[in-house]
Swiss-Prot record:
Entry-linked NCBIfam families: PRK01318.2-5 (NF002358), yidC_oxa1_cterm (TIGR03592)
Family as reported in the entry's similarity comment: Belongs to the OXA1/ALB3/YidC family. Type 1 subfamily.
Source species taxonomy: Bacteria, Pseudomonadati, Spirochaetota, Spirochaetia, Spirochaetales
This protein's record includes keyword Nucleotide-binding: no
Record's keyword annotation contains Transcription regulation: no
GO cellular component: plasma membrane
Species this chain originates from: Borrelia recurrentis (strain A1)
GO MF terms, alphabetically ordered: membrane insertase activity
Protein name: Membrane protein insertase YidC
Function (record text): Required for the insertion and/or proper folding and/or complex formation of integral membrane proteins into the membrane. Involved in integration of membrane proteins that insert both dependently and independently of the Sec translocase complex, as well as at least some lipoproteins. Aids folding of multispanning membrane proteins.
Length: 545
């Protein structure tokens, strides 16, 4: 095989691995909602001591629901809506994070079966609506009286919002004995968290690969929930999508996952061993971004005085995280100078290409050195064509005498794969790229594909007419042609497919990929074209000297 064809195959072998990587990544992450874990920590769960259904008047409950009023609370970052029925949070919108319809992202919304994202099983004891009281601009109480076994209790839910615009809500549960200083008669109650967060519009469902998942963090391990899983004393439990999540933390909690109405719920069991109840839940509801999550690991960084909560562990780290950290830092530096994330991706790409230029130059030089040996190689091939063993021996001898490595041009190309995979993971999951515009009217969101026309439905699995995939395909073809010295006439059918078929194949693979990733790829292709012209000129000048 000629050295140029060997290099060409190495290039497309790299592209093949890239395509497989992206397809597997998309497939595996889309199945997060059904992920399973084998390791379980069991604890004794006696359900007979939960809220007795005989204490619940279902007809009365329906009447209360019909008469419920909405209470709206606004902070700088949240627009929250509570219901006096149950005193529950029924809607939570993030003011600073818009969806594709340019409206605040609604991270919490009432479930279709009229079930809140999270609720307390003690709510079922209430036979009246909760009374709302605003303690101050950040603290809001919902109060009612409940009867348990002939004894009356004051039931209070206190929601405290951050004074420092942190994406955290403190929920305190109080159940105080009014009449008699006696046991409540209930062994435990449940905090129920379902997975129905971030309601997407029809367009959003087509554009975002918005997988849902329950996750739990315990014993320094991040795991995904499944029906029947029980965990004791986790750091937190939560539900999330690609970019947003709701995480719940509480001291000494026990969690059970169970399917109800075809929805996987997480039940936080809270033991009642006192005459009164006083429990505290910390609920993170916001972006899946370490910038907002990690402040709860150090007491001095958050207004709630929390430490070592480990919310940031919900953001999964890839094997190439050590490469992504400096890349993200470089992007941030460029963004601070020119506040455009699209340009930051382009500048990052140029920096990366400059850093790996020695590898690229070495690869091309190895190819050029092999090209010089073509006449001698052909002589050996003709002379020993009937003796494969002797042919290989003579070829090896020629390489040693000339000081040439026949695969020296392939390794530098393959060594660049980790860099691409790291960039892919960064661009595909970097939260700040969500909603970040590059060219208004064309590339309005770097986290999804570009669009010049939106169909409103799928046409052969496509939802939009996009331009970037066409540019990527053309520049990829030009880059491959410039990088090779092979004459088209000398190419066989297999090599011609590598030249023309692979870019077309990747056009379909990458069609719906985030525009930020395609900007990286296109910039790489253009830089490679210019780089190869420079290398050819440099080597030509050396030969002429």
């Amino acid at each position: 095989m000629s050295p140029n064809k060997r290099i060409l195959r190495a290039v497309y072998l790299s592209l093949f691995f890239i395509g497989i990587f992206m397809l597997l990544d998309d497939f595996l992450f889309s199945r997060k909602a059904s992920s399973f874990m084998n390791e379980e920590i069991k604890f004794d769960l006696n359900k007979d001591f939960d809220i007795d259904n005989s204490l619940i008047d279902e007809d009365f409950t329906f009447n209360l629901s019909d008469n419920s009023e909405d209470i709206n609370v606004d902070t700088d970052i949240y627009h929250a809506t509570f219901a006096t029925f149950g005193g529950n949070l029924i809607s939570l919108k993030l003011k600073n994070h818009l969806n594709l319809d340019k409206k605040p992202t609604e991270i919490v919304k009432v479930h279709p079966q009229n079930q809140s994202l999270f609720y307390i099983t003690l709510d079922k004891l209430s036979k009246s609506l909760f009374l709302y009281e605003q303690i101050d601009s950040h603290v809001h109480d919902f109060k009612t009286n409940v009867e348990v076994n002939g004894k009356y209790y004051e039931y209070i839910k206190r929601y405290t919002f951050s004074k420092s615009n942190e994406y955290l809500i403190k929920l305190e549960i109080f159940l105080n004995n009014i009449d008699v200083n006696d046991d409540i008669g209930i062994d435990f109650y449940k905090f129920v968290l379902n997975s129905g967060i971030e309601e997407l519009s029809a367009k959003g469902k087509l554009q975002y690969n918005n997988y849902l998942s329950h996750a739990i963090y315990y014993d320094t391990k991040l795991r995904y929930g499944k029906d029947g899983l029980n965990i004791a004393n986790p750091k937190w439990v939560g539900a999330g999508t690609k970019y947003f999540e709701v995480l719940v933390s509480k001291e000494n909690m026990k969690v059970e996952f169970k399917h109800e109405n075809k929805v996987l719920n997480a039940f936080i069991l809270n033991k009642l061993d006192n005459k009164n109840v006083s429990d505290v839940f910390y609920i993170y509801a916001g972006p899946r971004d370490n910038k907002y999550l990690d402040i709860f690991n150090q007491r001095e960084l958050n207004s709630f005085g929390l430490s070592n909560v480990e919310f940031g562990m919900s953001v999964e780290k890839s094997l190439l995280y050590f490469l992504q950290v400096p890349m993200q830092l470089i992007m941030q530096i460029f963004y601070n100078v020119i506040p455009n994330w699209g340009l930051s991706i382009m500048f990052l790409t140029i920096v990366v290409r400059i850093l790996i230029f020695p590898l690229t130059f070495k690869s091309f030089r190895a190819t050029a050195e092999l090209s010089k040996l073509q006449p001698k190689m052909k002589e050996i091939q003709v002379k020993f064509k009937s003796d494969p063993k002797r042919l290989n021996e003579e070829m090896g001898k020629l390489y040693r005498e000339e000081g040439v490595n026949p695969i020296g041009g392939c390794f530098p190309i393959l060594l660049q794969l980790p860099v691409f995979f790291a960039l892919y993971g960064l661009v595909n999951n970097f939260f700040v790229l969500r909603g970040a515009s590059f060219i208004p009217g064309w590339i309005d969101d770097l986290s999804i594909g570009d669009s010049i026309y939106y169909f409103g439905y799928k046409v052969f699995a496509w939802t939009d007419i996009r331009i970037l995939p066409f540019i990527m395909m053309i520049t990829q073809l030009l880059s491959t042609i410039v990088s090779s010295n092979v004459s088209f006439k000398s190419l066989g059918s297999q090599q011609k497919f590598l030249y023309f078929g692979m870019p077309i194949m990747f056009f379909f693979i990458l069609y719906d990929m985030p525009s930020g990733l395609l900007i990286y790829w296109i910039t790489t292709n253009i830089f490679t074209i210019l780089q190869q012209y420079y290398i050819k000129m440099n080597l030509s000048e050396r030969r002429n000297k």
